[in-house]
């Protein structure tokens, strides 16, 4: 957000700011962690609240970036997703369906996961490595609503996502298998 604020301070520049939601696809390492757990038959969730998520497949982000490069006279911010929202269980459901698996679904207590995130941060700072789970990432995971409206991107950039979550999960799993990540 600070970079966006600084960019907007130079109002004579043309710019397009892209804000993608949960980006997934080949080579992604963040959401891959969940893919890997589900592939092992484990479907963990943090807490037990209702959540809405938006996702976007990586090639759709690339498409939006190219469209933004050629946008004329813009000084706008665009939210990016596949244009839909999903409940917290949809990603796991689609991974299971695509892999034809059954899983054990369970909910971890929020305070337990917070404790793990704090320990992970401390350990990572000693090792001088990035933590897989930290308190900032946990805050993102705990957000009740990650849904975003992409109507500005549709009209301003002529953005039309090609992949919904089902198609994107299928392509992602093919890549993970072909490259021996799963």
List the model feature ranges, each with a label.
Residues 58, 93, 118-159:
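Conserved C-terminal active-site "lid" loop/helix of NAD(P)H-dependent oxidoreductases
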Residues 53-59, 86, 148, 163:
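Residue-level signal for the nucleotide or nucleotide-sugar donor/cofactor binding architecture
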Residues 68-132, 166, 170-171:
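Mid/C-terminal beta-alpha module of Rossmann-like enzyme folds, strongest
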